[in-house]
């Protein structure tokens, strides 16, 4: 992601919405060459970060994306140590959201995943995290949260029914962060959710946290 650093959106940290023709999702989208060995990067002084000597190329591989997506989603979700956080989807992006959620040390983390292999991966590597299948998720979350639902929900799966699952599992006045991208439009049943007073957050990642992410990797806080 490239950004000018000078427009209204960049000045407020919303670099995904940079108004420059060469800002936002430019490189590899509107500008060819994203998969080549060498690329000419617009606004390199604002958008590039030097990899510290203490961080290997392998560790840095996902910093620009998808680890940046998990970091951004966690930041805008306003997670506190008292929260129960539900992450829907344990694919690569879901795991990145989990890694960044762990930094916030919430009361409970629940991961909902339909794949047996992915559930076993979470259970093996993150035993402190609770894991549940989609069909049991709503009941499980209500039983393992303080206020009848998750305080924060991150929807990272992008499945046909996962958006509906996300808001149903959220407690009243919760934050529901839509990290996933969908193939089809999603229905927003406002009459059904009227009394829940939910806060929805969504959009493309603002990829301006890479320096902080590299520091966290260097310190061993993100593995």
Model-derived features: where do they sit?
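Glycine-centered, small-residue-biased loops immediately flanking beta-strands
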Residues: 83, 174-175
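Helix-to-beta-strand junctions that scaffold the AdoMet/dcAdoMet cofactor pocket
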Residues: 170-171
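Local beta-strand N-terminus motif with an aromatic residue
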Residues: 82, 128, 149-150, 222
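C-terminal substrate-binding/catalytic core of Rossmann-like NAD(P)-dependent dehydrogenases/reductases
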Residues: 139-143, 147, 181-223
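Mid-domain Rossmann-like dinucleotide-binding core that forms the NAD(H)/NADP(H) cofactor-binding site
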Residues: 50-135
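Helix N-cap at the beta1-alpha1 junction of Rossmann-like dinucleotide-binding domains, i.e.
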Residues: 115-117, 160, 183
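N-terminal Rossmann-like NAD(P) cofactor-binding module of classical short-chain dehydrogenase/reductase
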Residues: 154
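Glycine-rich phosphate/adenylate-binding loop and adjacent beta-alpha elements
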Residues: 1-48
């Amino acid at each position: 992601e490239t950004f000018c650093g000078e427009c209204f959106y960049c000045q407020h940290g919303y670099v995904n919405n940079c108004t420059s023709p060469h800002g936002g999702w430019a490189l590899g989208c509107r500008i060819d060459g994203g998969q080549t060995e060498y690329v000419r990067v617009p606004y390199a002084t604002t958008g590039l970060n030097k990899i510290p000597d203490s961080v290997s190329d392998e560790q840095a591989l996902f910093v620009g994306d998808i680890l940046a997506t998990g970091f951004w989603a966690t930041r805008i979700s306003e997670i506190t140590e008292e929260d129960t956080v539900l992450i829907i989807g344990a694919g690569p992006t879901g795991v990145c959201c989990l890694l960044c959620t762990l930094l916030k040390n919430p009361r409970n983390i629940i991961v909902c995943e339909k794949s047996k292999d992915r559930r076993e991966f979470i259970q093996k590597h993150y035993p402190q995290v609770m894991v549940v299948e989609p069909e049991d998720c709503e009941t499980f979350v209500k039983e393992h949260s303080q206020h009848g639902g998750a305080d924060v929900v991150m929807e990272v799966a992008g499945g046909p029914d996962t958006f509906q699952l996300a808001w149903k599992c959220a407690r009243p006045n919760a934050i529901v962060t839509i990290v996933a991208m969908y193939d089809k439009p999603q229905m927003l049943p406002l009459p059904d959710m009227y009394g829940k007073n939910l806060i929805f957050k969504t959009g493309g990642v603002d990829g301006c946290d890479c320096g902080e992410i590299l520091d966290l990797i260097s310190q061993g806080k993100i593995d």
